Amino acid sequence: MRLSLDSFRAGLHPGSTYRVAFSGGLDSAVLLDLMCQVRRVSGIGVRAIHVHHGIQPEADAWSRHCAAVADRYGVALDILQIDGRSRPGDSPEAAARTARYHSLEASLDPGDILVTAQHLDDQAETLLLQLLRGAGLAGLAAMPNAVPFGAGILHRPLLRFGRRDILAYAQERGLSWIEDPSNRDERYDRNFIRRRILPQLAGRWPAVAANLTRSAGHCAEAAGLLDRLADTLMAAATAADEPGTLVLEIVQRLQPDEQRLLLRRWIHKRGLRAPPAKLLERIRKEVVETAGDRTPMIAWAEGTVRRYRHRLHLLPPSADFDASWTAAWSGETPLTLAGNGCLHAALCPGPGIDPDKWRSGRITVRYRRAGDRLEPAGRRGHHELKKLFQEAGLPPWLRDRQPIVCIDGRIASVGGSQWLASEFAGAPERVNIVVHWTP
């Protein structure tokens, strides 16, 4: 498709404020030029963003070039400084891309539309990369045209146009751009596909980029259907009295492929990346399908799936905390529990700690110790905390994290105000001190 102002505007996501990701290269130079033309004829707001990765020695010169171009267009330019260096185990490409997108996402205001310059050939490269990595449908869907992004929307208005169309437009308009030497480095997978593989495929099948992009669209449609099916399965399996957990019996009645679909969606909905396929299958077999009352668990870098009392629990990585920690607390300001949330106290009607005993005693906060006992308000006799936790069905991995509030060294409440000691409990018809724990 020939790239022109009219053909570009026809596919532009409607909006009033656009942020143009501007690297200074060919593709983003064309994108900025087009957006400025749209601004001239329709009055939209346009602002450019340049990400300074600090990797290439030419990075400072590129920033100056982008500033000069933006100035000629009369467009404000924001330069975001990031550390794009890779960490152990990450590819340089992935590290730079992740850092770039995080910075762009954080820069958006509500209602902003971030436009980036990926095009038809980029889409074909992405699909080939995902195929070679053994990706599933979501990965093979490649790059969407528009997607929620931070406070705004990420939009790729050039996906319908090929690299040749973009180059022809730039030459017609007399645009200038910078060349990133790393784009010629075939040690990077994407460059190898771009420079070696796609040209050979195009020599045999000239429409290869368009055809691969069409296949990516089919995969995106199928992935959307599966997501909706997974949401239906998850709604049926989610415990009504414990949102976020799945009822084991319901999950066990599903077919293996439905179980895998559900597990992936469940993990994704919690904001975590699903484990590799082999590990997901281990979770299905060893945690879901294992018979009896066992409490198996499987962890990976992103989280842990555990089974307890006929429920499946998904836990994000927990911050380390010191079980021997103790601290004095006035109760007048919130108390931060390192790696375990915070406590705050408030006067509220209903069950709580007697305000007079609260004010007259020395308040400390700690965690469970061997032999800790409590006489719960409204019950006779002292009980080990371990037994109280078991009665309440508190999962084992949460028991040692329950903050314990003591007055003059004696337990007054546990887990915020979930368990109150009878000797410190106020009359329930009065206004009392209620301790709230936010994990």
UniProtKB/Swiss-Prot annotation:
Q: Name one GO cellular component term.
A: cytoplasm
The molecular function terms of the Gene Ontology recorded here are: ATP binding; tRNA(Ile)-lysidine synthase activity
Instruction: Report the record's Gene Ontology biological process terms.
Output: tRNA modification
Sites binding ATP sit at S23, G24, G25, L26, D27, S28
Give the matching SMART domains: TilS_C (SM00977)
Query: Which key words are in the record?
Result: ATP-binding, Cytoplasm, Ligase, Nucleotide-binding, tRNA processing
Q: Which Pfam families match?
A: ATP_bind_3, TilS, TilS_C
* Record's catalysed reaction(s): cytidine(34) in tRNA(Ile2) + L-lysine + ATP = lysidine(34) in tRNA(Ile2) + AMP + diphosphate + H(+)
Write down the EC number.
6.3.4.19
Q: Look up the domain of life of the source.
A: Bacteria
Q: Say where the protein is mainly found.
A: cytoplasm
Q: Where in the cell is it found?
A: Cytoplasm
Family statement drawn from the similarity comment of this UniProt entry: Belongs to the tRNA(Ile)-lysidine synthase family.
Q: What does this protein do?
A: Ligates lysine onto the cytidine present at position 34 of the AUA codon-specific tRNA(Ile) that contains the anticodon CAU, in an ATP-dependent manner. Cytidine is converted to lysidine, thus changing the amino acid specificity of the tRNA from methionine to isoleucine.
Q: What does UniProt say about this protein's domains?
A: The N-terminal region contains the highly conserved SGGXDS motif, predicted to be a P-loop motif involved in ATP binding.
What NCBIfam families has UniProt attached to this entry?
A: lysidine_TilS_C, lysidine_TilS_N
Name this polypeptide is given: tRNA(Ile)-lysidine synthase
